[in-house]
């Protein structure tokens, strides 16, 4: 796998969960706790959380491809990826223009696409060694930094993969991923805005549905 393909995989794949249920009226909030300043203990907790989830996903992906494995993967991704937050940030101002029914449809499609692409990406990088290289505070919580290097192509430079996380209840959720300093959320936002401007809301939904039923990895 080339470096460009790997980066593309991370950008088109990585993020976010907790099956959404939209109530009547305003769209449901994600349950995010106001963070304020994040303590050293909380930072360490976030780092340990993503390390554990990451290792569990890799362990599941090393098992034979069965319906049980697919179920385990879906459950694991739902434990650390915040689909609600990702969807809101990716749609930006468009979020407030859409009905609960439209948002429910959108988030369901986004979740399915992310799950599929995350699995493909992780499977293709099982031979990469991941190192965790520190943290930094951000407004929403903490960014946990890592790098991935191929164990078979050691001359290939490592890829940096950073996880933006925030506390939700008593746990942590990932709401953005930076691959070589490129934001997944910003990448989605740019793509979604372009499609909506050119083809309208239904055009975006149609493209997402088509993508789910095809091998094409780009919107």
What does each model-identified segment do?
Residues 176-219:
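Low-complexity, intrinsically disordered terminal/linker segments enriched in charged
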Residues 8-19:
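Bacterial N-terminal signal peptides
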Residues 116-159, 211-219:
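Surface-exposed, charged secondary-structure patches
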Residues 24-44, 154-156, 206, 213-219:
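Compositionally biased, proline/threonine/alanine/serine-rich low-complexity intrinsically disordered stretches
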Residues 1-5:
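Positively charged n-region of N-terminal signal peptides that target proteins for export
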Residues 158-186:
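Short beta-strand edge/turn micro-motifs at domain boundaries
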Residues 95, 112-113, 137, 150-152, ...:
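Solvent-exposed loop/turn segments at secondary-structure junctions
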Residues 31-118:
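Early exported N-terminus immediately downstream of N-terminal targeting peptides
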């Amino acid at each position: 796998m080339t470096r460009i393909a790997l980066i593309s995989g991370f950008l088109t794949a990585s993020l976010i969960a907790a099956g959404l249920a939209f109530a009547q009226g305003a769209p449901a909030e994600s349950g995010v706790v106001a963070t304020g300043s994040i303590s050293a203990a909380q930072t360490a907790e976030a780092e340990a959380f993503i390390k554990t989830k990451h290792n569990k996903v890799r362990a599941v992906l090393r098992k034979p491809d069965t319906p049980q494995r697919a179920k385990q993967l879906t459950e694991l991704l739902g434990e650390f990826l915040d689909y609600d937050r990702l969807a809101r940030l990716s749609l930006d101002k468009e979020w407030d223009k859409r009905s609960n029914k439209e948002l429910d449809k959108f988030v369901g499609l986004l979740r399915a696409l992310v799950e599929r692409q995350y699995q493909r990406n992780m499977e293709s990088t099982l031979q990469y060694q991941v190192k965790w290289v520190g943290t930094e505070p951000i407004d929403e919580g903490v960014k946990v930094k890592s790098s991935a290097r191929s164990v078979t192509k050691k001359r290939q430079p490592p890829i940096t993969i950073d996880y933006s996380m925030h506390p939700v209840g008593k746990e942590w959720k990932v709401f953005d991923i930076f691959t070589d300093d490129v934001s997944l959320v910003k990448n989605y936002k740019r793509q979604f805005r372009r499609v909506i401007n050119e083809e309208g809301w239904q055009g975006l939904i149609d493209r997402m549905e088509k993508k789910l039923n095809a091998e094409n990895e780009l919107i």
